[in-house]
Curated annotation (Swiss-Prot):
Organism: Gluconobacter oxydans (strain 621H) (Gluconobacter suboxydans)
Known catalytic reactions: N-terminal L-glutamyl-[protein] + L-leucyl-tRNA(Leu) = N-terminal L-leucyl-L-glutamyl-[protein] + tRNA(Leu) + H(+); N-terminal L-aspartyl-[protein] + L-leucyl-tRNA(Leu) = N-terminal L-leucyl-L-aspartyl-[protein] + tRNA(Leu) + H(+)
Coiled-coil segments on the chain, per record: none
GO cellular component, one term: cytoplasm
Keyword Cytoplasm: yes
Record localization: Cytoplasm
Disulfide bonds: none
Family classification: Belongs to the R-transferase family. Bpt subfamily.
Keyword set includes Protein biosynthesis: no
Enzyme nomenclature, EC number: 2.3.2.29
UniProt keywords, alphabetically: Acyltransferase, Cytoplasm, Transferase
InterPro entries registered for this protein in UniProt: Acyl_CoA_acyltransferase, Asp_Glu_LeuTrfase, N-end_Aminoacyl_Trfase, N-end_Aminoacyl_Trfase_C, N-end_Aminoacyl_Trfase_N
Superkingdom classification of source: Bacteria
Record's protein name: Aspartate/glutamate leucyltransferase
């Protein structure tokens, strides 16, 4: 049986969403067919990310700032502040469910985008776009819904299961309570869930030195980053 070659494409240059006065380009490929899960695993371990049925990675000319990052669950050491955030939400009910979009999730998503990313592309997403973000996946994907004891939905994390870990695809949350630190809490929970499942790493996407949007990721240590074809501790990362 002949296998068709895996095709990769390069996008046209576009404004960088993370650093001013820079241009981004991506290489992408479709995740489809019986080998989609295996391909997703290999590409994730090589620094790619998933959106819908597409795996992508930055290939920007003259810039290597976007650095794939993952957290080794076994050696993760929460800071004192992170421990306080975790203990603050011990009453939350967490439900892990299939990637099925709901109106309740979408309302939370819209409020999150309007406050946190009003100028981003996702701020203009309609219900159909949101449903595609959640449900269009060729791999093993789940949602974690975080609810208060009264049932109020406060945070949602979309995650993929890989052969060696979990991949945090997208998280959104209640922006009305700034003291809750839902973003930090969700990452702490995902690290714990990675360990609970007996997996090694939580893949966090791209760390971008100099980008305020991505600075929070360096707080979860000790993280590993992927550069020059290998994973190494962030402390060994040279400037981009």
């Amino acid at each position: 049986m002949q296998h068709r070659p895996q095709l990769f494409y390069t996008t046209a240059p576009a404004p960088c969403p993370y650093l001013p006065d820079r241009t981004e380009r991506k290489v992408l490929t479709e995740l489809a067919g019986p080998d989609a899960v295996a391909l997703h695993n290999r590409l994730s371990q090589a620094g790619f990310r998933r959106s819908h049925a597409i795996a992508y990675a930055p290939v920007c000319v003259g810039c290597r700032a976007c650095t794939p990052m993952r957290i080794p669950a076994a050696t993760f050491a929460p800071t004192r502040t992170q421990k306080k955030i975790r203990s603050r939400h011990t009453d939350l009910v967490v439900n892990i469910i299939p990637p099925v979009p709901t109106d309740e999730q979408f309302r939370l998503f819209e409020m999150y985008q309007a406050v946190r990313h009003p100028d981003g592309d996702m701020a203009h997403m309609c219900w159909r776009d949101y449903a595609e973000l959640i449900a269009n996946t060729p791999v093993e994907t789940f949602l974690a819904e975080f609810r208060r004891p009264d049932g109020t939905l406060v945070c949602v994390s979309l995650m993929d299961r890989l052969s060696d870990g979990l991949s945090a695809v997208y998280t959104f949350y209640d922006v009305n309570d700034l003291t809750a630190s839902w973003g930090t809490f969700s990452i702490l929970w995902l690290i714990e869930e990675t360990a609970r499942l007996g997996l090694e790493h939580l893949y966090l996407g791209y760390y971008v030195p100099g980008s305020p949007k991505m600075a929070y990721k360096a707080a979860f240590g000790p993280p590993e980053v992927f550069r020059d074809g290998q994973w190494s501790l962030l402390a060994a990362l040279s400037p981009a």
